[in-house]
């Protein structure tokens, strides 16, 4: 009768034990997925597989084009949602629409870097429908593979918003439309109107309207930044259209202006020369002598 046999952790067990990779122990990297994203055919030389990497934090979205080398991963180009205020989007930097803008920005940036931006303009008007870039006569489109990391790939996840932005920007990324926002499982097809609504922030606009009617006080607090910037539900679509146009006009990364280093106060005493030390000693001696002479005069007056 077989059963569960507890591992005997003997001297031999510990001697032969091999630890897993550090990023596996930390739960940061799925190596089963990574090896398939990075391993290139052995008959191809100096032709890396490029990955379209998307990661989310609480306040930012990071999109990168990365390729692997023996020395480590090399980031060829990157775009962040905190760059979007430069293009006119100052609030809502982590939603589906912002993810689309970040993906679009990265696509236009990397194509500009490779000199393909004129040849592959992508889908200029976002309609919500699926889009595949058509190869041109001279140069093939820039191909990358979607790297989602440890994100759970549910339908409508923001990572697919970034993917859609990159596709409309002109990148060639193998994909299916099954995970875009608006895909209907029963009908097995994408509802492009719903997807377009998400791309232009329509879901946020609907939420703004419903909250303004039902809970006005909560609305004032929840959308305080939107209200400060003068953004309302009706102007949401026009705002995102302007952002998309601004990204296409200038996708290059802005150079950061470095401030001049501040002059720090010196707290350590500056080293004095021999003449300065001698003069200082003379001053101190004179001060002591004068104070001693003043004390003697006071004592004589008291005796009288």
Curated annotation (Swiss-Prot):
One of its GO terms (cellular component) is nucleus. Keywords: Cytoplasm, Nucleus, Ribonucleoprotein, Ribosomal protein, RNA-binding, rRNA-binding. Disulfide bonds: none annotated. One of its GO terms (biological process) is ribosomal large subunit assembly. It comes from the Eukaryota. One of its GO terms (molecular function) is 5S rRNA binding. Signal peptide: none annotated. Gene3D superfamilies: 3.30.420.100. CDD domains: Ribosomal_L18_L5e. It is found in: Cytoplasm; Nucleus. Its main location: cytoplasm. Pfam families: Ribosomal_L18_c, Ribosomal_L5e. Belongs to the universal ribosomal protein uL18 family. Component of the ribosome, a large ribonucleoprotein complex responsible for the synthesis of proteins in the cell. The small ribosomal subunit (SSU) binds messenger RNAs (mRNAs) and translates the encoded message by selecting cognate aminoacyl-transfer RNA (tRNA) molecules. The large subunit (LSU) contains the ribosomal catalytic site termed the peptidyl transferase center (PTC), which catalyzes the formation of peptide bonds, thereby polymerizing the amino acids delivered by tRNAs into a polypeptide chain. Component of the large ribosomal subunit (LSU). This is Large ribosomal subunit protein uL18y. It comes from Oryza sativa subsp. japonica. The lineage of its organism: Eukaryota, Viridiplantae, Streptophyta, Embryophyta, Tracheophyta.
């Amino acid at each position: 009768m077989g059963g569960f046999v507890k591992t005997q952790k003997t001297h031999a067990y510990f001697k032969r034990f091999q630890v897993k990779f550090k990023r596996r122990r930390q739960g940061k990297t799925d190596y089963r997925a990574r090896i398939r994203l990075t391993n290139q055919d052995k008959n191809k030389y100096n032709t890396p597989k490029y990955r379209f990497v998307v990661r989310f934090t609480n306040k930012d979205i990071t999109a990168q084009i990365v390729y692997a080398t023996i020395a480590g991963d090399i980031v060829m180009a990157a775009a962040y949602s905190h760059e979007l205020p430069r293009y006119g989007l100052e609030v809502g930097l982590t939603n589906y629409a912002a993810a689309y803008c970040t993906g679009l920005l990265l696509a236009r940036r990397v194509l500009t870097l490779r000199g393909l931006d004129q040849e592959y303009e992508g889908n200029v008007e976002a309609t919500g429908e699926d889009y595949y870039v058509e190869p041109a006569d001279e140069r093939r489109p820039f191909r990358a593979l979607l790297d989602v990391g440890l994100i759970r790939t549910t339908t409508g996840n923001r990572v697919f918003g970034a993917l859609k932005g990159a596709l409309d920007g002109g990148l060639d990324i193998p994909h299916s439309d099954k995970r875009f926002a608006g895909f209907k499982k029963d009908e097995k097809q994408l509802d492009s109107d719903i997807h377009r609504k998400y791309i232009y922030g329509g879901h946020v606009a609907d939420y703004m309207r419903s909250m303004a009617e039902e809970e006005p006080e909560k609305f004032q607090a929840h959308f305080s930044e939107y209200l400060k910037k003068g953004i309302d539900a009706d102007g949401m679509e026009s705002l995102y259209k302007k952002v998309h146009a601004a990204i296409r006009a200038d996708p290059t990364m802005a150079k950061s202006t470095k401030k001049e280093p501040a002059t720090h106060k010196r707290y350590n005493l500056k080293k004095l020369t021999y003449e300065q030390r001698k003069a200082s000693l003379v001053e101190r001696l004179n001060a002591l002598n004068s104070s001693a002479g003043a004390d003697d005069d006071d004592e004589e007056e008291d005796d009288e």
